[in-house]
From Swiss-Prot:
<comment type="function">
    <text>Protein that binds to ssRNA and may be involved in genome packaging.</text>
</comment>
<comment type="subunit">
    <text>Homomultimer.</text>
</comment>
<dbReference type="Pfam" id="PF01518">
    <property type="entry name" value="PolyG_pol"/>
</dbReference>
<comment type="similarity">
    <text>Belongs to the aquareoviridae NS2 protein family.</text>
</comment>
<keyword id="KW-0694">RNA-binding</keyword>
<dbReference type="GO" id="GO:0003968">
    <property type="term" value="F:RNA-directed RNA polymerase activity"/>
</dbReference>
<dbReference type="GO" id="GO:0003727">
    <property type="term" value="F:single-stranded RNA binding"/>
</dbReference>
<dbReference type="InterPro" id="IPR002507">
    <property type="entry name" value="Reovirus_polyG_pol"/>
</dbReference>
<protein>
    <recommendedName>
        <fullName>Non-structural protein 2</fullName>
    </recommendedName>
</protein>
Length: 352
C-alpha cells in the first residue's frame, strides 16, 4: 500500500534551457531558448529580448505593476551579490562601478527631462549626476509616469497619458519632421542623441495598438495615438523614453564593436543576426545610423555579428541609398531602388 507522503522519484526530464548572450549590454541582450527533446537535434530560438524589454518602458503602468505590491522594498545598492546590469537598468538602479554604456549629462538633457516630467525632474536626474546610463534614466522616467517615486517607491500621481495607455499591448514608433507645409514621416537625420532636446521630444509619434484575437469582438478601438489626445495628456515623456532607448542601442553597439571578447562569444551564433535586425528595425526611424544599418542588411544580409559591427563602425562600406517611408496599415514600409526593403513594425510592450 503506497503512502500518501511518498516522494515521487521519477520526474519528467526537462528538455528546455535558456541562455543569454551580451548580458553586459542592456539593450543588446539576446536570449536563446533551446529544446533538446529531439534525438541528435537541438532546436534553438533566438530573440532580441534586450530591445523588447527596453520598449516596455513605453507602457509604464504595465511595466512596473509588480512594484505596487504592499511591502515592496527597493533592492539595496550594496547587495551581497552584484546586481546584473540589465536588472539594474530596468529597475532604475545603477551599478556601483561605472560602466562604459553611459553618456555625459549636459544642460540639453536636463532641459529635456524638465520638459518631460516637470514636477519630478530633480529626482529623476539629480543635480549631482554627471554621467548616466540612458536606459536607467528611461526606467526612472517610466516609474514616475506610472505613479511611483523613483527613489523610495512611494505612491505619487501617475501621468494621465500612462493611464490611457495601460491596456495597450504594442506601439509603433514614427519620427516626423515638421516644416512649413506640415508634418511628414522622415528618418531622424542625426544620431539618436539629437532627440534628447526639449524642442525635439514632440517629433517622435507613438501609435499604440491592441492585440485583437479571433474570439474577441472587433468593435473596440484599433489604435490609440497620444499625440491626438487633448493637451491635458502630456506626450513629451514618450519622446524622451524613445530617444533614450535609441541612444542606449547606439552606445551598446559602439561598446560591443570595441569588445573583442564578447565578439568571439557571439560570432558562432549566426542565427541571431536576423532576429536582432528584425527588432532593431522598429527603432530605425529614430536614427540615421540605425536606419543605414537596417537598409544595408536588407540589401545584403550580414553573415554574422562581426560583419554587422564592421558596418556599424564604418557605414561607408555600403553607400547609402535614398529610401522612401510610407505608412502601410500597422507598419511603415521602407523602400529603395524601386523595391521594398523592410517594414518597421510595432514593438510588443506587454499590457495589463
Amino acid at each position: 500500500m503506497a503512502h500518501t507522503g511518498t516522494a515521487t522519484l521519477i520526474n519528467a526530464e526537462r528538455t528546455d534551457r535558456t541562455l543569454r548572450l551580451l548580458e553586459t549590454f542592456p539593450s543588446l541582450t539576446i536570449t536563446i531558448r533551446q529544446d533538446t527533446s529531439g534525438r541528435d537535434l537541438v532546436s534553438s530560438v533566438y530573440s532580441a529580448t534586450g530591445m523588447s524589454a527596453a520598449a516596455r518602458n513605453l507602457n509604464p503602468i504595465a511595466n512596473v505593476k509588480n512594484m505596487r505590491q504592499p511591502g515592496y522594498v527597493k533592492p539595496a545598492h550594496t547587495a551581497t551579490n552584484t546586481v546584473p546590469l540589465r536588472v539594474a537598468t530596468s529597475t532604475g538602479l545603477e551599478l556601483p562601478t561605472a560602466h562604459l554604456a553611459q553618456m555625459p549629462v549636459d544642460q540639453a538633457l536636463r532641459d529635456a527631462v524638465a520638459a518631460a516630467v516637470p514636477a519630478h525632474a530633480a529626482r529623476v536626474l539629480p543635480p549631482n549626476v554627471d554621467r548616466v546610463t540612458p536606459l536607467t534614466l528611461a526606467s526612472r522616467v517610466a516609474m514616475v509616469c506610472a505613479g511611483l517615486d523613483c527613489d523610495d517607491i512611494h505612491e505619487i500621481a501617475p501621468a494621465p497619458t500612462a493611464m490611457a495607455l495601460a491596456f495597450t499591448t504594442k506601439v509603433l514608433l514614427i519620427h516626423v519632421v515638421v516644416d512649413g507645409t506640415g508634418a511628414s514621416i522622415a528618418v531622424n537625420p542625426g544620431a539618436a542623441r539629437d532627440l534628447l532636446k526639449a524642442d525635439q521630444l514632440g517629433n517622435v509619434i507613438t501609435n499604440y495598438g491592441y492585440d485583437v484575437r479571433g474570439t474577441v469582438r472587433r468593435d473596440t478601438a484599433a489604435a490609440l495615438a497620444p499625440s491626438e489626445l487633448p493637451d491635458t495628456y502630456p506626450i513629451e515623456w514618450l519622446g524622451l523614453i524613445c530617444g533614450l532607448i535609441a541612444t542606449q542601442i547606439e552606445l551598446d553597439l559602439d561598446m560591443l564593436a570595441m569588445n573583442q571578447t564578447e565578439q568571439k562569444l557571439i560570432a558562432p551564433h549566426v542565427q541571431a543576426v536576423d532576429p536582432f535586425i528584425n527588432r532593431l528595425q522598429s527603432y530605425a526611424t529614430l536614427s540615421s545610423r540605425l536606419m543605414h544599418l537596417c537598409v544595408t542588411h536588407a540589401q545584403r544580409p550580414f553573415r554574422d555579428f562581426p560583419e554587422l559591427l564592421r558596418h556599424w563602425q564604418k557605414p561607408e562600406l555600403t553607400p547609402a541609398i535614398p529610401v522612401n517611408i510610407a505608412l502601410k496599415g500597422a507598419a511603415l514600409e521602407v523602400s529603395g531602388n524601386g523595391a521594398e526593403l523592410f517594414r518597421v513594425r510595432a514593438l510588443p510592450i506587454g499590457g495589463m
